[in-house]
Amino acid sequence: AVNDLEKTESYFLDKLGFSVRFRVDGWSFLSLGSFHVMLGYCPDELPARDTHEHSYFAYVNCEGIDEIYRDYQQSGAEIFQTIADKPWGLREFGVATPEGHRIMFGQDRPLGG
C-alpha cells in the first residue's frame, strides 16, 4: 500500500532500476529481473515509515550484490543499511522507499568456520 503511487513508482524505476510490467487503475506492476512488485494506491493507509519495524517490504536474493549496491549509491537510492557480510551467510544491504518501505538485498556467501 502506497499513498503516492506516481512518486513511489518513479522511485522504483529511476533509483532502483525496475521496469513497468503493466498498470491498471490504482496499481502498478513492476519487475527487476525475476523479482516482481505490485504497488497499490491506498491514500488513507498509514505510511510505512510510521509502522517502524513493521515497514520491511521484501527481501531480494540476488547475484552481483556489490555492483547493485554501487548502482544504487550512484542513482541516489536511500540506503538505510550499508552493505556488509552477515554471520548468517549473506552479504546484504537495505534501501528505503520515499514512504518508508524497507527492502533488503542479499547474496549468499560461504559461511566461515
What are these regions (language model features)?
Residues V2-L5:
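Conserved beta-strand-loop-alpha-helix junction that forms the acyl-donor binding cleft
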Residues S10, S19-E63, E67-A96, Q107-G113:
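Vicinal oxygen chelate
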Residues E99:
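Conserved ATPase active-site switch/coordination loops adjacent to the nucleotide-binding site
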